[in-house]
């Protein structure tokens, strides 16, 4: 049986990886890594994988990672990527392939689409998942921000879903983490200011990577966009110890 394992390799720091992930990367027949189409530079997941796998076991798979809309270019990239992985299995029947993804493979990851399309092409494929540490967890740890306590709820929100839904999430959940804002950072900060939540928020960009930036959201320039790899945690308002129980 062909086996495809989606492995989370964490947000950036090569030590933020499970032992299981490290062991798999060290022994897999091949490690596929997603890279942006046409970008010759080292991919984000690839940079971490290089700490655990020799370069000759790494195969780059191109995706339309920077496309903002879901269109034909993205569809073609998924099909081409799945064809590449399926062709590898055709040449290595019964082998195990790892697909490395930043953070966790079940959180906004290209792995979801890839695995479904490869299974469609091959008919039979054992798909497994190894969880990874997310940027949200790294930022919470680095800033000493307990995400949730007692009966508090937590929402993970993609800013690409729009400012109105962000506002709604802030009303309905105790803690809200925002992903995928980058150029939408001024919009996210405006909502936080309007809802009185700016002082509850911390910001982290390029966590564990060169150029990392971690600061209270109220210290950010309200008009300047952030990089794609940026995360905001809006922490719950809390009373004293155990107040959320
Ligand atoms: C397509 S999602 C991938 C999420 C990833 N699978 C995870 O579990 O964290 C990309 C978003 O994750 C967040 N992110 C991932 N790595 C990050 C990092 N090193 N620093 C800050 N944010 C990061 C950003 O919000 C970015 O827009």
Give the label of every model feature segment:
Residues 8-9, 99-102, 131, 158, ...:
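Small/polar loops that bind or transfer phosphate-bearing groups
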Residues 30-37, 129-131, 202-205:
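Short internal beta-strands
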Residues 61-63, 130-132, 159, 204-206:
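Conserved beta-strand termini and adjacent loop/short-helix elements that scaffold enzyme active sites
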């Amino acid at each position: 049986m062909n086996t495809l394992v989606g492995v989370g390799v964490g947000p950036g720091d090569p030590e933020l990886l499970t032992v299981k992930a490290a062991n798999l990367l060290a022994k897999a027949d091949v490690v596929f890594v997603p890279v942006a189409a046409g970008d010759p530079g080292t991919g984000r997941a690839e940079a971490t994988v290089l700490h655990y796998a020799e370069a000759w076991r790494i195969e780059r798979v191109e995706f339309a990672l920077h496309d903002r809309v879901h269109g034909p270019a993205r569809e073609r990239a998924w099909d081409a990527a799945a064809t590449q992985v399926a062709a590898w299995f055709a040449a290595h029947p019964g082998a195990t392939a790892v697909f490395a993804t930043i953070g966790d493979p079940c959180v906004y990851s290209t792995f979801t689409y890839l695995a479904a399309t490869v299974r469609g092409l091959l008919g039979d494929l054992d798909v497994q998942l190894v969880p990874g540490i997310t940027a949200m967890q790294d930022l919470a740890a680095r800033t000493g921000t307990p995400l949730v306590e007692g009966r508090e709820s937590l929402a993970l929100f993609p800013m690409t879903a729009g400012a109105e839904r962000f506002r709604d999430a802030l009303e309905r959940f105790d803690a809200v983490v925002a992903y995928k804002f980058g150029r939408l950072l001024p919009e996210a900060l405006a909502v936080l200011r309007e809802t009185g939540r700016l002082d509850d928020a911390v910001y982290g960009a390029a966590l564990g990577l060169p150029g990392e930036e971690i600061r209270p959201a109220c210290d950010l320039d309200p008009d300047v966009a952030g990089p794609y790899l940026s995360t905001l945690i809006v922490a719950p308002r809390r009373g004293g110890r155990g107040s959320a129980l």
